[in-house]
Amino acid sequence: MKTLPTLLLLCVALCSAYPLDGASRDADTTNMDLLQQYLENYYNLEKDVKQFVKRKDSSPVVKKIQEMQKFLGLEVTGKLDSNTLEVIRKPRCGVPDVGHFSTFPGTPKWTKTHLTYRIVNYTPDLPRDAVDAAIEKALKVWEEVTPLTFSRKYEGEADIMISFGVREHGDFIPFDGPGNVLAHAYAPGPGINGDAHFDDDEQWTKDTTGTNLFLVAAHELGHSLGLFHSANPEALMYPVYNAFTDLARFRLSQDDVDGIQSLYGPAPASPDNSGVPMEPVPPGSGTPVMCDPDLSFDAISTLRGEILFFKDRYFWRKSLRILEPEFHLISSFWPSLPSAVDAAYEVISRDTVFIFKGTQFWAIRGNEVQAGYPRSIHTLGFPSTIRKIDAAISDKERKKTYFFVEDKYWRFDEKRQSLEPGFPRHIAEDFPGINPKIDAVFEAFGFFYFFSGSSQSEFDPNAKKVTHVLKSNSWFQC
């Protein structure tokens, strides 16, 4: 319940701006309550009331209104004018406000540059893969401008635990239903610190028809990394939700970049190669050309947030931080791996990439081939008639790996470590529109990308349809 002194102070601040007679009385009372709640939640009104009353040289409410207006980039009037009322009615982050790009008090930050995250539960508003893609994209926003990297955990504790909840949801800071507070997050540290919570009473969307999950997640994860709110209306870390119309062209403002780099420094000029000597790529007619319109790939896999495109003795290493991919000999990273590999895929939960050539396969972690490899593909359960794998992909959400051989495919259960019964099945049955001659495949942003010759097909595994057809080397900005 609001205290009488506070209500009287609110009346002093507001009566001159809004007459309290007739039909406007109820609306004015509602606006006053909204303002008081806003100042208490985001500008520490109750904490400072006694201090201001003792001084008796200004109204704490008027001063707080001025502080709020200045921070939000409004005209500083000290009154609840129409522009101020419009802003405080908008949906926003639940974390309190401070000025310019800011970090939490004491400047908490992670003491390591590789962080883990876990999506604890899901909103029913979106398919799971759409939630996964939004969170992954939100993390990439910060990864691109810092040395930070992220990997996902599917069980146990992660540095950043991401969850959806309504009202009272376990942290003593309840949500308020649809609108107003969209989400909140905690500064870096152990336990609940670093975690991000999203109000599931909101209508979460992939576009701007409701509340865009990617935009809110990118903002909240900024808090999880140590940033507080910015007074710059162009910044992602501005507290009031701003629905960008062109999500495909979204970029951090310089204010956001300055803030996060004040904590972690800039992104490295190129990915860290962990001391592996780089063998120069020899020139010659046999060297594949990145923007060759007829370029095809032998295999493609992700590796710790990067994408590896294999071709003959070489591979391109594509980081989302850098437009230009690196080009290396396979032997410069993994001397014992063969050239012209057949298939490759990453199991993120095991931090392992598997490479296939003929009837053998290898397991690599980072720059090291694991002991006990190569092994026969028949140890995975394939019949002896299978002599090579054309392409493979591991679905991180379903924890299934798909192996494509000619016009059929097998499915492997990563939990049970065995091929599933009922396979093989024809590719055309479950992947309509996909050329059965598959050279390579990998997953990104909730889609499967199938490569056949010089073209690729973006496939939605939930809708079971091809959504785009592109050139194979479009990932190289060709």
UniProtKB/Swiss-Prot annotation:
Binding-site residues, Zn(2+) 1: H169, D171, H184, H197
Disulfide bridge positions per record: C291-C478
Major subcellular site: secreted
Binding site for Ca(2+) 1: D125, D200, E202
Key words, A-Z: Calcium, Collagen degradation, Disulfide bond, Extracellular matrix, Hydrolase, Immunity, Innate immunity, Metal-binding, Metalloprotease, Protease, Repeat, Secreted, Signal, Zinc, Zymogen
Residue numbers binding Ca(2+) 3: D176, G177, G179, V181, D199, E202
PROSITE patterns attached to this UniProt entry: CYSTEINE_SWITCH, HEMOPEXIN, HEMOPEXIN_2, ZINC_PROTEASE
Catalytic activity: Preferential cleavage where P1', P2' and P3' are hydrophobic residues
Cofactor note (record): Binds 4 Ca(2+) ions per subunit.
Cofactor(s) it depends on: Ca(2+); Zn(2+)
Spans of repeat Hemopexin: 288-337, 338-384, 386-434, 435-478
Enzyme nomenclature, EC number: 3.4.24.17
Cell location: Secreted, Extracellular space, Extracellular matrix
UniProt motif (Cysteine switch) ranges: 91-98
Signal peptide stretch: 1-17
Pfam families with a match to the protein in the record: Hemopexin (PF00045), Peptidase_M10 (PF00413), PG_binding_1 (PF01471)
Catalytic site positions: E220
List of residues binding Ca(2+) 2: D159, G191, N193, D195
Recorded family membership: Belongs to the peptidase M10A family.
Name of the protein in question: Stromelysin-1
Organism: Oryctolagus cuniculus (Rabbit)
